[in-house]
A protein has these predicted regions:
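Active-site-proximal segments of metal-dependent phosphoesterases and phosphodiesterases across multiple
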Residues: 147, 153-175
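A short acidic, amphipathic alpha-helical/loop segment
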Residues: 56-61, 83, 144-147, 168-172, ...
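Binuclear metal-ion centers of metallo-dependent hydrolases, dominated by the metallo-beta-lactamase
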Residues: 9-10, 82-90, 118, 170, ...
Length: 218
């Protein structure tokens, strides 16, 4: 008997996703309006802001065996965590999670104070079943994106204000060159321009997910 393994990605809300693969359930950036149901094997948090780290939703899916990877500053909200700094990685039952840089250098809450300063949060590379999924977290288009290596799916924020806008998100997609790019953290803004910019200049396919919609990797 041959068992065919697959990987799927569900947009729950905003920047919150469920990834299913390798026999595991992974959640990323659960927030108030996400509605997770299944218990988690792994929970990832990019940073402590409420729209990425909701204690109630995390506790809903957490059990005694759940691996919770999050920055140190999340401890006060969600308890014991395993922090990974950019460049550090962790293997969990055949799934590899690597933290990468995520920060603002051109978006500020006040002069000289970026919304997401370097060192506050991270993005993640999740490798499962031979596929690599990149969740960028809250970030501008940063030079480190060009050094990510092979990425099958890139989850990229395009909503502006706190993150890349559509134009910058497209530039990031072109630099990363994933097989699939999925916009997130859009704040309800139109993603058609993102899709147009990316697909006009690369072989990357843009997949726009609605909340609750699932994408299966080939």
């Amino acid at each position: 008997m041959v068992f065919i393994m697959s990987v799927s990605i569900i947009l729950l809300a905003h920047a919150a996703f469920q990834i299913r693969g390798g026999g595991k359930i992974i959640y990323i950036d659960l927030e108030e309006y996400s509605d997770p149901v299944e218990k988690a094997d792994i929970v990832l948090v990019t940073h402590s802001h409420t729209d990425h780290c909701d204690p109630d939703k995390i506790n809903r899916v957490r059990n005694s065996s759940t691996v919770l990877i999050a920055p140190e500053e999340c401890r006060s909200k969600i308890g014991e965590v395993t922090p990974l700094k950019p460049g550090e990685s962790m293997a969990i039952d055949g799934i590899k999670v690597k933290a990468v840089q995520a920060y603002n250098y051109k978006r500020f809450r006040s002069p000289g104070k970026p919304y997401h300063p370097k060192g506050m949060g991270v993005g993640y590379l999740i490798s499962v079943e031979g596929k690599t999924i990149y969740h960028a977290g809250d970030t501008d288009f940063i030079p480190e994106m060009k050094e990510l290596g092979t990425v099958d799916v890139a989850l990229l924020p395009t909503g502006d204000t706190y993150t890349m806008d559509v134009k910058e998100g497209a530039e990031a997609a072109l630099a990363i060159n994933p097989k699939i790019a999925i916009p997130m953290h859009t704040w309800g803004k139109d993603t058609a321009e993102f899709k147009k910019r990316v697909e006009a200049k690369s072989s990357t396919r843009v997949v726009v997910l609605q909340e609750g919609e699932e994408y299966h990797l080939d």
